[in-house]
Amino acid sequence: MHELFLDIETSGLNPDKHSILSIGMVVSLNGLIDYQSFYREIKHDELVVAPEAIEINKYDFTTQKNRVPLVAADEAAVIFLKKYYRPDEKPLPIGLNVGSFDMQFINRQMPLLSAKLSHRAVDLNSLMYMLAHKHSKDFKELKKELSDKAHNEVSGFALGVSKHNALYDAVFNLCLYLMIKEDFIS
């Protein structure tokens, strides 16, 4: 499988109105033991910002240091993917709400990356819903249990970032996916 663990942070919920603030991607070479990551913060001259989005992702608008234009981030993301996938491969985005949220922004705002990715996506919420059914558990209870376990594991990686950072959340998605996959196999 051509998995790609993906997360973005945005200035709001509407991909036609709001902007991608940062993107994190993770390619797993050997589970959590060996993975490669990509992270960029995006520089914008103008932004439409939904206050609730900033409350969640705690984005700092006071500095543009280390931020790149969206076009440069789009190009760099494709260069990153070319290191790990053959030209004929279309990596499958995996994450929480990745198809219904993240990919809507990527399809509109990062056309080079969008063209490189599969048009399909795997939403980890759907897989957890299936696991909840398998174990006769409440979905929200199972999601909290697995999320807490994944956060505890990812927090130990000393990434230098925390929850609601696109890189942290991409690694979190990988960890959560591996736990779900292991449960399905057992």
What residue spans do the PLM features occupy?
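Substrate-recognition/cap helix-loop segment adjacent to the acidic, metal-dependent catalytic center
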Residues: 101-120
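Short, flexible, mixed-charge acidic loops at enzyme active sites
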Residues: 47-56, 139-151
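Short alpha-helix plus adjacent loop in nuclease-associated cores
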Residues: 122-137
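Acidic active-site catalytic centers that drive phospho-/nucleotidyl reactions
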Residues: 7-9, 102, 123, 169
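Short conserved catalytic/interaction loops centered on acidic-Pro-aromatic/His motifs
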Residues: 114-118, 137-142, 185-186
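Acidic, Mg2+-coordinating catalytic module of metal-dependent nucleases/exonucleases
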Residues: 93-96, 104-109, 141-186
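Conserved non-catalytic scaffold segment of RNase H-like nuclease domains
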Residues: 2-4, 9-100, 155-158
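Short, function-defining helix-loop hinge/capping sites that tune catalysis or transport
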Residues: 15-17, 32, 105, 131, ...
